[in-house]
Amino acid sequence: MWTFAIVLAFLLIGLDEGEALDGYPLSKNNYCKIYCPNTEVCKDTCKRRAGATDGECRWDGCYCFNVAPDTKMYPGELPCH
């Protein structure tokens, strides 16, 4: 029983790891921030919660954008200012 609790705790802690500041963080269910070169990639990687600069991939409340490599991004921040 304790082993299950410890494994579950590590899994929950690991969900918040992997964020980056270089514009290419890991995908998350609700805070998906992935480099999206085009609409097709956005749809596949962000489950239609995406935004690409080609103008074909726009949804409200999206967290996935085509951003410059030097754009600083933080968890939960929209990089479209």
UniProtKB/Swiss-Prot annotation:
- Coiled-coil-forming residues are none
Give the primary localization class: secreted
Keyword Transferase among record annotations: no
Q: What is the annotated signal peptide range for this record?
A: 1-20
Which segments constitute the LCN-type CS-alpha/beta domain?
A: 21-81
Q: Name one Pfam family in it.
A: Toxin_3
Question: Which UniProt keyword terms apply here?
Answer: Disulfide bond, Ion channel impairing toxin, Neurotoxin, Secreted, Signal, Toxin, Voltage-gated sodium channel impairing toxin
Tell me the compartments it is located in. Secreted
Molecular-function GO terms, alphabetical: sodium channel inhibitor activity; toxin activity
Question: Record's GO cellular component, any one?
Answer: extracellular region
Please give the SUPFAM superfamilies that the UniProt record associates with this protein: Scorpion toxin-like
> What tissue specificity is annotated for this entry?
Expressed by the venom gland.
Cystine pairs = C32-C80, C36-C57, C42-C62, C46-C64
What family is reported? Belongs to the long (4 C-C) scorpion toxin superfamily. Sodium channel inhibitor family. Beta subfamily.
Function of the molecule: Alpha toxins bind voltage-independently at site-3 of sodium channels (Nav) and inhibit the inactivation of the activated channels, thereby blocking neuronal transmission. This toxin binds, in vitro, to sodium channels and inhibits the inactivation of the activated channels. Seems not toxic to mice, crickets and sweet-water shrimps.
Entry domain remark: Has the structural arrangement of an alpha-helix connected to antiparallel beta-sheets by disulfide bonds (CS-alpha/beta).
Q: What is this protein called?
A: Toxin TdNa10
